[in-house]
Swiss-Prot record:
Subunit structure: F-type ATPases have 2 components, F(1) - the catalytic core - and F(0) - the membrane proton channel. F(1) has five subunits: alpha(3), beta(3), gamma(1), delta(1), epsilon(1). F(0) has three main subunits: a(1), b(2) and c(10-14). The alpha and beta chains form an alternating ring which encloses part of the gamma chain. F(1) is attached to F(0) by a central stalk formed by the gamma and epsilon chains, while a peripheral stalk is formed by the delta and b chains.
Single GO MF descriptor: proton-transporting ATP synthase activity, rotational mechanism
Listed InterPro entries: ATP_synth_OSCP/delta_N_sf, ATPase_OSCP/d_CS, ATPase_OSCP/dsu
SUPFAM superfamilies named in the record: N-terminal domain of the delta subunit of the F1F0-ATP synthase
NCBIfam families on file: ATP_synt_delta (TIGR01145), PRK05758.2-2 (NF004402), PRK05758.2-5 (NF004404)
Domain of life: Bacteria
Protein name: ATP synthase subunit delta
Summary of the function given for this chain in its UniProt record: F(1)F(0) ATP synthase produces ATP from ADP in the presence of a proton or sodium gradient. F-type ATPases consist of two structural domains, F(1) containing the extramembraneous catalytic core and F(0) containing the membrane proton channel, linked together by a central stalk and a peripheral stalk. During catalysis, ATP synthesis in the catalytic domain of F(1) is coupled via a rotary mechanism of the central stalk subunits to proton translocation. This protein is part of the stalk that links CF(0) to CF(1). It either transmits conformational changes from CF(0) to CF(1) or is implicated in proton conduction.
Amino acid sequence: MSEFVTVARPYAKAAFDFAVEHQSVERWQDMLAFAAEVTKNEQMAELLSGALAPETLAESFIAVCGEQLDENGQNLIRVMAENNRLNALPDVLEQFIHLRAASESTSEVEVTSATALSEEQLAKISAAMEKRLSRKVKLNCKIDKSVMAGVIIRAGDMVIDGSVRGRLERLADVLQS
């Protein structure tokens, strides 16, 4: 987890509450996603780590974002720049997404496998996780050859390791003890 999570949480909460109040959650998520990508730009990263005055930095950042930010999004950027927190934007986005998922009673579930899973396998995993978590789930699938076979499922703090690699690691631990 990033060092900015604690810093990002209040900004994400404020943005989320505002977005819900104004029925613009999707728009806010899009704005935050775009702004988070801008912070990853090499030239912008140099500006963010430089010694620019907060007002100058905010206006430069807003100029780069252009029409992607509405007036309220620009105000968030100004406040974050004033507090030297623009580097936390990717974490603000992440926290915003978590808040949205919680409000919509959905959970992000990461499924890592050695090969692409069939629709039937994904449906079974989705159904099992929905039952276990008592909420809707959104599967994010990744392929990692080092898993060898099986799957690793992550949902928040919960990890279900049904991979051959995981079994081999547990066997090695038992043999070493």
